[in-house]
C-alpha cells in the first residue's frame, strides 16, 4: 500500500503543474469514486457525495444516509498552490537579441532553484465568449516542452559569487529566455493561441505559471525517497483526496459528514475569494446543512462539535543544517506524519487536537512525530489558524516531512505518503 500511494503521489503531481490542474486531477479521482460535481449557482442534491471546484480550490463532501441533525463535520484542509514564477499580463521583453517573458515571484520561492532548468508553462486562459455574453470561456493550458529557461551567470563573470553566495534580483536577473528576437517568430499571445487552437484576438487574460519539466521519481540507494516538485503542498492535497476516496469506499464507525477542502492562495496569505480566509467553506457547510433540512440551530450545533485537520508539509531535519532546528523535536523522513505545535498559535494545535490525532494514528498503526520550531526563529503558518478562527472549530495542524521546501525540486520519504493517507482515512472513518 505504501509503494502504491507513493507512485500515486508522483502521478498526481506530474498531472498537476498548476492549482487549476491539481483541482482537475483531484476532481477526476473523486468522480471515479462516485462523487458528483456541482456548481455554486445551482441547487445541490440532498445528501450524497458531491464536490465543487472554483478556480484553484476544490471542496468535496460525503453525507451518509440517515445522518442525525446537528452531527459534527469531520474536515480536512490542504492547499493546491506552490511557490513558483508567474507570467505578467504584458510579459514580452527584448534584450540583446533575446525574447524574454517578465515574471512575478509567487510566494516564498527559492528562486535560485529555478535557474538552468527546462521550464514549461501551465495555468488557465480566459477567452472571449463565443455566444456574445460577458462571461469568459476558461480553458486549462499546459505546454510540456522546454519552452523557457532562466540562465545563470557564469562564475568567471561574477567572482564574488563563490565567497558571498548567489544574490538574485527577480526584476532583472530572473527573466526567462523564450527565444531569439528578429526571426519572424509569433508573439506570446500567438503562441498561446496556437496551443489552444483559437484566434489570438480571442485571448483576454491568463493566470499562467512556469513549471519544471523533470518528472517525479523514486530516489536514494533503496528508493526510499521521492524526488519531485510541488510537494508543498500537493503532497498533502493528494493524501487528503485519497483519504476521502478510501473513506467513501468503506464503512464508518458512526455516521458523520466528511469534508475535504483544497484551497488556493495559501502561499500568499489565503485572503482571497478562493482562499482559506474567504467565505467559500462556511457557505458550503451551511448549504450542506440546509439541503438536509436542518435548522440554524442544528447547523450551529454541528459546527460546535466539528473537528478540522490542516494538512501541510513539515520540515525534516537537514543533516547539513542541523543548527536551524529545535533539537528536541526533529523530524525524520519515513517516520510518519508530524503534529505541528507553536505556542504563538502559528499552528492551531492544542493539547486536545494533539491527543486526537495521536489516537487516530495509533488506531491506524501509523507512527507519529511532533514538530516545533526553534524559539529564536520565527515560525511559518498554515491555513489551520485561519480556519480555526473563521469556523470556530477544534483544529490540529499536521503534515508529513520533506527537505528543500519551496525549492523547484523537493524530497520526501516514500513511505510517508502511505502513512499520511492511512492517518487521514482513519480520521474520516473512525
Where are these regions (language model features)?
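N-terminal hydrophobic/helix-forming segments and targeting peptides
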Residues: 1-430
